[in-house]
From Swiss-Prot:
GO terms for molecular function: cyanidin 3-O-galactosyltransferase activity; flavonol 3-O-glucosyltransferase activity. Catalyzes the glucosylation of quercetin. Preferentially uses UDP-glucose as sugar donor, but is also able to use UDP-gal and UDP-xyl. Is probably not required for the accumulation of anthocyanin in red-fleshed kiwifruit varieties. This is Flavonol 3-O-glucosyltransferase F3GT2. SUPFAM superfamilies: UDP-Glycosyltransferase/glycogen phosphorylase. CDD domains: GT1_Gtf-like (cd03784).
Length: 458
């Protein structure tokens, strides 16, 4: 056997939808920097790899190589605007598309795969790893709170039942460590409500059942954010390794700021500007966009709004002209840099996990408008567990709900307390990625897991 064939080779299986592939690639790049002799084959769909692998990053790491796998869409089939259709096709192609991709990676590299690093969604990777005789290391790209909900799905279903009524929707999960603030109604779809038999819900259920088989479960968070949940997960899983927040644990990068957001922010006082963004996938319904715009115009607070161009016709007539003196609307903003800017006073967000972490590391309290997935659960933790933000009255944007939330953050004692709380969390996050911090130690454990992978045939 050649020395090349004995080289460590990690197959990385990415979920190609939403904001899953990018955090996984960021983790892989950290690992590749610390393990320059280890080969990482990053497997995802062609469309996902095109977006996730900009040319600069591809050229930066000699030991990270993307491989395209079949997306499951039949030849000649046109995907509609519904994103769930593409997800459904992809799920039907699993795991055969990844098996084919791994075979190609082994053939091209001449190195047998020694480890599977996967999105935690892929419960079947436990079976693949067992067949191959290699470790399975799943990466949960969200927080410990949502992971706990999936690990404890059967307990939740037995305790609360699967039928929501007006009497039980506000029942809390006080029987699960760290989730006492969470209401039954906050749970992601597929845990207790929604179509429990859908392929996606079944995938998440099987994930929760199979994670105890994993060599280690890696989380995109830090232990000090959810200590009780982390302690409980450590009793249920073999290794629980929080390695974030990624914006603090990785080398700082400067994104292009073609819209001049940072220069515009430089002109404003500390903690005076509202930053508004709902990520790259979500756009609030037109009536809510209109209400949000009316609230911003009426309140006259300085604001920076990242909003795709196709949504701008929703604005009230004359809106952009009316707010020119105190507002700025852009099609894209360098979010991590914006949230780190001292002039930002509040983040109006959908509560995606990456956005929450960036808000914490920026020390910016939040106004929450969740839409789907783990976002409602995350927003509950933001408001009632960590006390670093507020949810909108009624759960949606109206002119009055937005103005009330803004007034609370900027003008009331409660808002001052929220800011103090998130500054304390920011320090804990900074400490976690320090030289002797918990996330640094966990990352070193992950490095050892990979370094000690043995050739499956040795």
């Amino acid at each position: 056997m050649s020395d090349h064939s004995k080289a460590l080779h990690v197959a990385v299986l990415a979920f190609p939808f939403g904001s899953h592939a990018a955090p996984l690639l960021a983790l892989v790049c950290r690992l590749a920097t610390s393990n320059p002799t280890v080969r990482f084959s990053f497997l995802s769909t062609a469309q996902s790899n095109t977006h996730t692998f900009p040319s600069t990053r591809t050229n930066e790491f000699d030991n990270v190589r993307p491989y395209n796998v079949w997306d499951g869409v039949p030849e000649g089939h046109q995907i509609s605007g519904n994103p769930h259709v593409g997800t459904g096709f992809f799920l039907k192609a699993l795991p055969h598309n990844f098996k084919a991709g791994m075979a190609k990676a082994e053939e091209e590299s001449g190195a047998t795969i020694n480890c599977l690093l996967t999105d935690a969604f892929f419960w079947f990777a436990g079976d693949l790893a067992e067949e191959m005789g290699v470790p399975w290391v799943p990466y949960w790209t969200a927080g410990a709170c949502s992971l706990s909900a999936h690990v404890n799905t059967d307990v939740i279903r037995i305790t609360l039942g699967s039928t929501r009524t007006t009497q039980n929707t506000n029942q809390t999960l006080n029987f699960i460590p760290g989730l006492s603030a969470v209401h039954m109604n906050d749970l992601p779809g597929g845990v207790l409500h929604g179509d429990l038999e859908s392929p996606f819900a079944q995938m998440l259920h099987k994930m929760g059942l199979n994670l105890p088989r994993a060599t280690a479960v890696v989380l995109n968070s830090f232990e000090e954010l959810e200590p009780a949940i982390t302690t409980d997960l450590k009793l249920r899983l073999q290794k629980v390794l929080h390695v974030g927040p990624p914006s603090l644990s990785s080398s700082p990068t400067s994104s292009l700021d073609e819209s001049g957001c940072l220069l515009w922010l430089d002109k404003h006082e500390a903690a005076s500007v509202a930053y508004i963004s709902f990520g790259t996938i979500i756009t609030p319904p037109p009536n809510e966009l209109l209400a949000l715009a009316e609230a911003l115009r009426a309140s006259k607070i300085p604001f920076l709004w990242s909003l795709r161009d196709h949504s701008r016709p929703i604005f009230p007539e004359g809106f952009l002209e009316n707010v020119l003196a105190f507002g700025k609307v852009v099609s894209w903003a360098p979010q991590s840099q914006v949230l780190a800017h001292p002039s930002i006073g509040v983040f109006v967000t959908h509560c995606g996990w990456n956005s929450i972490l960036e808000s914490i590391t920026g020390g910016v309290p939040m106004i929450c408008r969740p839409f789907f997935g783990d976002q409602t659960l995350n927003s509950r933790m933001v408001q009632d567990a960590w006390r670093i933000g507020v949810r909108l009255d009624g759960g949606v944007f109206t002119k009055s709900s937005m103005m009330s939330a803004v007034e609370l953050i900027f003008s009331r004692e409660e808002g001052k307390k929220l800011r103090e709380n998130i500054i304390l969390l920011k320090q804990k996050a900074t400490d976690a990625v320090g030289a002797s911090g918990s996330s640094t130690e966990n990352f070193n454990v992950l490095l050892e897991v990979i370094k000690t992978c043995k050739h499956p045939k040795s």
